[in-house]
């Protein structure tokens, strides 16, 4: 009389896996007293060679059932255990990005400056408190802002950053006025502007103007506009000089 060892598939088990995994061995779910070397199958009686699966092929929220059956020597009955796997989504925070805005510009969505295909719903942290994922140069400090998505275990959290810099718009100065005689010498309109106007702008007005010079003998009085542009992404800013002749 020969006594055979009855097969032991262990207890049913369930776990969650992250879909960032490309390889997972189901044998790790077996109890310590369960011998490996049996066969693994999933729904449809599909054989799983070696018990190794690829969680990344499944959509988030998918539930997949596997059966483990150790070899059963005659006349012992077969035994099996059911392993239920739930697939969870690995958060995608995208890739690092940069945002250059104008110091006087409107608020911008930092999410739009992340690379890749980031998931929505994360949280922002940085040098200033962030509301609604917006960067507002009027009230916030430039620097590195991090975007974080929390992962449900066993998935891990994911983070990326947006580095914000601010460009300072050029200053055209402040409006000025001047009254001249028709026989006065020519003068530079920039000298009439108040403040500290940036150099390199352009002048436009009732008469064509070259180099910012106004010549009472050949030019018409009126409002002359001084415009400076940039740097990118800042737009243009203007100031005026109103010329009167007596």
Language-model regions, residue ranges each:
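Proline- and Ser/Thr-rich low-complexity, intrinsically disordered segments
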Residues: 1-246
